[in-house]
Amino acid sequence: MLENKNFKFIENEIKNNKVVLFMKGIKKSPACGFSGTVVAILNKLGVEFRDINVLFDAELREDLKKFSDWPTFPQLYINGELVGGCDIARELYQSGELEKMLKAYTR
């Protein structure tokens, strides 16, 4: 099997950053409402996170879907694990679970 450069990039990012958001746009200027919602949640919680814009690299978008087995964006990773997209992040935030997860892994 050939080595996938995007898989290596993804693995490196989620290994070296406690919180990573693969999103449409950037945290200062989200390009879709779903990405904007997750950025707003993370900002409300005061979390530093690595944002990676997937809009301009179709190959990265497709490889990320394969890597995560998750078909949509944004994709939120905490401590190397996929948490999910906008709906899951919102539900976890509203229940208080997201804050607990972030405190456990970002201290």
Curated annotation (Swiss-Prot):
Binding residues annotated for glutathione, in chain numbering: K24, R61, F73, C86, D87
Any one GO molecular-function label of the UniProt entry: metal ion binding
Binding site for [2Fe-2S] cluster: C32
Entry keyword annotation includes Iron-sulfur: yes
InterPro entries, per database record: Glutaredoxin, GRX_PICOT-like, Monothiol_GRX, Monothiol_GRX-rel, Thioredoxin-like_sf
Keywords: 2Fe-2S, Iron, Iron-sulfur, Metal-binding, Redox-active center
Keyword tRNA-binding: no
Residue ranges of every copy of the Glutaredoxin domain listed in the record: 7-107
Entries under PANTHER family matching the protein: GLUTAREDOXIN FAMILY MEMBER, GLUTAREDOXIN-RELATED PROTEIN 5, MITOCHONDRIAL
Family, as annotated: Belongs to the glutaredoxin family. Monothiol subfamily.
Protein name, entry field: Probable monothiol glutaredoxin 2
Species of provenance: Rickettsia conorii (strain ATCC VR-613 / Malish 7)
